[in-house]
Structure formats: structure tokens, C-alpha cells
Amino acid sequence: MRNAMAGVVFAIVVAGTGAGVGGADGSTDEAEVLKLDQRIADAVVRGDAAFVDSVTPPDFVMVHGDGWTNGGKPLLTDTEQSMLRRVTTKYYDVLDFDSVKAEMHGDVAITYGRYLAHTTSGDDPGRRWFSVWFERVYAKRDGRWVYLSHRTVHGPTFGADRKSVSDK
């Protein structure tokens, strides 16, 4: 319940800073944001830091782990530069999205859903596969969508193989 409430509070705070919900081209913007969300994930797996850099601002923030949702600390907080280093080193070799939706607020979009990920780094094979439920924030700047922020709202949940995390 706390995790759900934290996500709702976060969404309300972010939405409150933007324009009203929707617009004449809301469905086009929604499709564009969802496509960009996937393109970013694909670029991360490819190690395409140039593309990821082109759609993230210098004040980008990525909060890993859901400890923050109940008063604790996140596992890690990335800036744009530390996240780009992770992209360059191809930390993730799988980043598959599912259940992703977009909530549109004029020139602000919140995407939320889950991804399954795999990394070859680390000594513990039981922590190489994981699932994460997330919220991401985008803003339309100068006619294009920019990826501002990512927050884990549940997870990561680790497992030894894809199947062990696919229902988490």
C-alpha cells in the first residue's frame, strides 16, 4: 500500500506542475512517448550512449530501488553522467518492457509499468535477472519529448533466471 501511495503522490506532484490533462493531439503524443520509452531501452542495451544523451537533460535523475517509497533510501541514484556510463559499458544485456502505459498532462507525460532486465555483471548469478516496476517523467521541450526522471516504485526483485522474475 505504501508503494502505491508513494507512486500516486509522486504522480500528483509532477502532474500539478504541468498543464491540464490531454489535448487535441494527446493520443499522438502518448504514442510518441511510449515509442520513445522503448527506443531508450533498446539504446541502453545496444550501448548507444549518444542516443540516450540526446533525449536526457543534464539534470536527469534515476532512482534505483523502492526503499524511498517507505521512508528509506534508494539503492542508488544516477545522474545523467553516471547513467550514461552504465549505458556505455552495456551493463544491461536485456531490458524488456511490459505493462507500460502513459498518463498525459499537456507537455508532461508519466509512463509507468514494468521491465525485466538481465546483467552479466556481479558475482551472484541469483541477482542477474530482475524485475522493476517504475514511473518515468517526460516533458515536451522545443517540440520534442525529453526523458527527465525514472523512479523505481517496486523492486528490484531478483532471480536466477527470467522465469523466476517474470511474475514479480
Question: Where would I find each of the regions flagged by the language model?
Answer:
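Short glycine/acidic-enriched loop and turn motifs that connect beta-strands
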Residues: 117-118
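A solvent-exposed, acidic/Ser-Thr-rich amphipathic alpha-helical stretch
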Residues: 28-34, 49-105, 114, 126-130, ...
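A short, polar/proline- and glycine-enriched secondary-structure boundary/capping micro-motif
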Residues: 121-124, 157-162
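Short beta-strand edge/turn micro-motifs at domain boundaries
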Residues: 131-158
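A short, structured loop/turn motif at beta-sheet edges
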Residues: 102-109, 125, 138-145
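Short, low-complexity N-terminal intrinsically disordered segments enriched in polar/charged residues
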Residues: 10-12, 18-59, 107, 148, ...
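Short hydrophobic/aromatic-rich beta-strand segments that constitute the beta-sheet cores
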Residues: 62-63, 111, 147-149
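Bacterial N-terminal signal peptides that target proteins for export
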Residues: 1-8
